[in-house]
Amino acid sequence: MKILLANPRGFCAGVDRAISIVERALELYQPPIYVRHEVVHNRFVVEGLKQRGAIFVEELHEVPDDNIVIFSAHGVSQAVRQEAKERALTVFDATCPLVTKVHMEVARASRKHMEVVLIGHAGHPEVEGTMGQYASLQGGMYLVEKPEDVLGLKAIVKDPSNLHYVSQTTLSVDETADVIDELRRVFPEIQGPRKDDICYATQNRQDAVRELAKDVDVVVVVGSKNSSNSTRLKELAEKLGTPAYLTDCPQDIEPQWFDGKVKVGVTAGASAPEELVNQILTRIKELGAQSVEEVLGREENMFFEVPKELQIKQID
């Protein structure tokens, strides 16, 4: 049995930045450091940060006064920002800059009193944060998940000629394309972002899985079940006809996943660390894999700076 390892895989620039923000805050300010929501959706990463003194909460009322709070990579609503300001909490914002771009699109549309449609999954923290950027009382903001949801908007959209759409950054490109096509069919005048909202890392990892799935008998996606982009990778492989499994724990891997399989594809969601990928590879080798081959893929050079207050100066 042979393992083919997808490229690119694992951490993206936004996740790297978010984790660095928590690590540097712990180093510079000492524990406890509070983090609103899991900084990234990966159990392995979150447990490691907890052990170093990070305390993860779901809402700001769980953060004691006079403390530091970090907003997760998924972003927060304006109401959460205002609450932090009113309580004079020290805030470090780990929102991915690509999510912030979508937030700015929504805020801009809101100022123009345009109605906005967000393509995304209800309950996902990125969606909650993005919906929370809209403030216009004259317009409205609506969430759709699939093409079938679009027709229902006809009864509630006030002005189809003044309508804009944005997308959750971690959806599959295919998923959003179908919804966008339906939006344009039902609302021919709808406007969209100048550049697709799906982030570069999501796109690149999905492209890599498309190629990988053609050449293997089964795909293992390293990532947590609450990670949207990791789940999309699994679904994409399955859509292409290749059995796929999502795991963030080597002990969860079942020997029968590989019964009769010759080639095993392995990739990782944008919030999965390479350390965890290596643990998964070790487990698959224990189950009979004899070699690992890296598959060539698109090179990524994206880098996002941490806030200047957390930039640790080198001492000569």
UniProtKB/Swiss-Prot annotation:
Binding residue positions for dimethylallyl diphosphate: 41, 74, 124, 227-229, 271
Pfam families: LYTB
NCBIfam families: ispH_lytB, PRK01045.1-2, PRK01045.1-4
One BP annotation, GO: dimethylallyl diphosphate biosynthetic process
Top-level taxon: Bacteria
Pathway: Isoprenoid biosynthesis; dimethylallyl diphosphate biosynthesis; dimethylallyl diphosphate from (2E)-4-hydroxy-3-methylbutenyl diphosphate: step 1/1; Isoprenoid biosynthesis; isopentenyl diphosphate biosynthesis via DXP pathway; isopentenyl diphosphate from 1-deoxy-D-xylulose 5-phosphate: step 6/6
EC number: 1.17.7.4
Cofactor: [4Fe-4S] cluster
Active site: 126
Tagged with keyword Iron: yes
Name of the protein in question: 4-hydroxy-3-methylbut-2-enyl diphosphate reductase
Record bears the keyword Oxidoreductase: yes
Record keywords: 4Fe-4S, Iron, Iron-sulfur, Isoprene biosynthesis, Metal-binding, Oxidoreductase
Cofactor, how bound (note): Binds 1 [4Fe-4S] cluster per subunit.
InterPro entries: LytB/IspH (IPR003451)
Residues annotated as binding [4Fe-4S] cluster: 12, 96, 199
GO molecular function, one term: metal ion binding
Record family assignment: Belongs to the IspH family.
Database matches in HAMAP family: IspH
Catalytic activity: isopentenyl diphosphate + 2 oxidized [2Fe-2S]-[ferredoxin] + H2O = (2E)-4-hydroxy-3-methylbut-2-enyl diphosphate + 2 reduced [2Fe-2S]-[ferredoxin] + 2 H(+); dimethylallyl diphosphate + 2 oxidized [2Fe-2S]-[ferredoxin] + H2O = (2E)-4-hydroxy-3-methylbut-2-enyl diphosphate + 2 reduced [2Fe-2S]-[ferredoxin] + 2 H(+)
Binding site for isopentenyl diphosphate: 41, 74, 124, 227-229, 271
Transmembrane spans: none
Positions annotated to bind (2E)-4-hydroxy-3-methylbut-2-enyl diphosphate: 41, 74, 124, 169, 227-229, 271
Function: Catalyzes the conversion of 1-hydroxy-2-methyl-2-(E)-butenyl 4-diphosphate (HMBPP) into a mixture of isopentenyl diphosphate (IPP) and dimethylallyl diphosphate (DMAPP). Acts in the terminal step of the DOXP/MEP pathway for isoprenoid precursor biosynthesis.
